[in-house]
Swiss-Prot record:
InterPro entries: AAA+_ATPase, DNA_helicase_dom, DNA_helicase_pif1-like_DEAD, P-loop_NTPase, PIF1_helicase. SUPFAM superfamilies: P-loop containing nucleoside triphosphate hydrolases. Its cofactor is Mg(2+). It holds the Pfam family Herpes_Helicase. GO terms for biological process: DNA recombination; DNA repair; telomere maintenance. Monomer. This is ATP-dependent DNA helicase Pif1. DNA-dependent ATPase and 5'-3' DNA helicase that efficiently unwinds G-quadruplex (G4) DNA structures. May be involved in resolving commom issues that arise during DNA replication, recombination, and repair. Keywords: ATP-binding, DNA damage, DNA recombination, DNA repair, DNA-binding, Helicase, Hydrolase, Isomerase, Nucleotide-binding. Belongs to the helicase family. PIF1 subfamily.
Amino acid sequence: MFDKLEKILAYDNVFLSGGAGVGKSFLTNELIKSYRKQKKLAIALGSSALSAFNIGGVTLHSFFCLGYCDDMMKLSVLDRNQKQKEKLTKLKELLKTIELIIIDEISMVSANVFEMIGFRLKNSQFNGKILVVGDFFQLPPVIKEKKETLFNHSYYAFSSFFWQDLNFKNIKLSQPKRTQNMEFYNHLSLIRQGFLDEKILSFFESLRIDYKELENLEDDYTLLCGINKKVNNINQEKLSKLETPLVCFKAQVKKEDKRIKDEELDSWIRSLNILEELNIKIGARIIFCVNNWDKNYYNGEQGIIEDILYEEEKIYISIIKNNGMKILLEPYTFFMEELEQSGKDFVVNILASVTQFPIKLAYAITIHKSQGMSIEKLVCDIDHIFENGQLYVALSRATNPNTLKIYSTKKINFGFYFANILKIDSNVIEFYKKHNFLDLEIQEQII
């Protein structure tokens, strides 16, 4: 399928969209491999450190030298700095050699940030193509301050002037890869767009459980909820019930480049889906937080800690996965990187690194940290749903409706409450209605 996408990218910039679990990330990674095999220069950028890691790239803030700026005014001040000017000179040289820029999780990129990216590319006279990947029906950009901007009507990247300039060819994927249950997938597809009828409501209400049923569920279920405090409390409570000794692993942080400020490094570490202090016990249920196909685990897969092994200077965690496979887990190193021009190619400079076991306790996780995961046995606590797309993201982590449960303490009518927390931004609905999408899997023009 990536060969079709590759042909389109020869002539057009592309927006690749589609619901949760349709294979957007897989297709993107296959495209990157294809470009690199052909010795074409393609750079993969993530909206966060985690999304950058998932596609083997760097963050767009790092690549485009945006610092902590969230609007053009702040960027213009930053660009007066002499060190910044040196970075921008290198960026211009690098952009001359790149044939494709990929930006993942575009829904998390604000209109202001996308406009700043446009400013960088226009100043560098970039002649390559741009592929943006994501689903605006999922989690929106994180806006720290709801201040006056050029794009007050919408904070999404598609509201920026630069988005219009790119004249994207809109493409979508529509066939489920996460679940094989088509009824479940079709219901999810409709609530993704904010559509809810009696049939859909009845389907999800049939999955509801009460507190007693929640307490009686086996520990191999993961509870998703909207607030960190509840997640931490549940995980600590479950861990405390295990009678085995507590073991703490602290992340090993190395700053390779003295130019990196401590607050910048801390912010990068926080954006990764790992813990600075990992507290575990033998017998604890864990969830993997990254994809590492070479080592036989993926983001969202679960297992139980069988043992902790100390061999000479190395430490391994023996984990029995839910499928029965046993693996010896090693610490994983994440790198904070920047790209630099080197002749006709580019080199990767390591600015900092953090090494930690890429797991968390699996009894509970937040909805925001679950994005991109596929979870087999899932309980969605819908008491604290407050963000656009959050309910859809939570429910669509499930791989099988037979092992999906919905929990709420609300005393009001379930249907009324469910409809009330099904929050979809009207700008997103209007955007998808207004644009035609070519379905890459059935090759028909969809309105």
